[in-house]
Amino acid sequence: MSLPRNVIPMPRSRFLRVKCIDCGNEQIVFSHPATRVRCLVCGATLVEPTGGKGIVKAKILEVLE
């Protein structure tokens, strides 16, 4: 009997590099936030929590691993 390849499962959450639609500021955010994530420059909402995966209201530039 062989062992399964994924003995330890990888998390489904990621960090995202997003760009604010209002001011163009680039910021790194978590994909599953517990609180509302706001832009550090203008204060616009970038990600809203939903109890799981957040609703991203900014442009996703890159998924970081």
From Swiss-Prot:
**Tell me, what's a Pfam family for it?**
Ribosomal_S27e
Q: Which family does it belong to?
A: Belongs to the eukaryotic ribosomal protein eS27 family.
InterPro entries, alphabetically?
A: Ribosomal_eS27, Ribosomal_eS27_Zn-bd_dom_sf, Ribosomal_zn-bd
Q: Name one GO molecular function term.
A: structural constituent of ribosome
**Which HAMAP family does this entry report, sorted A to Z?**
Ribosomal_eS27 (MF_00371)
Q: Which GO terms describe its biological process?
A: translation
The gene designation is rps27e
What cofactor does its activity depend on? Zn(2+)
Q: How does it assemble?
A: Part of the 30S ribosomal subunit.
Q: How is the cofactor bound?
A: Binds 1 zinc ion per subunit.
- Where is Zn(2+) bound in this sequence? 20, 23, 39, 42
UniProt cross-references to Gene3D superfamilies, sorted A to Z: Zn-binding ribosomal proteins
High-level lineage: Archaea, Methanobacteriati, Methanobacteriota, Thermococci, Thermococcales
The C4-type zinc finger ranges are 20-42
Xref: NCBIfam families: PRK00415.1 (NF001629)
Protein known as: Small ribosomal subunit protein eS27
Q: Which UniProt keywords apply?
A: Metal-binding, Ribonucleoprotein, Ribosomal protein, Zinc, Zinc-finger
Gene Ontology CC, one term: ribosome
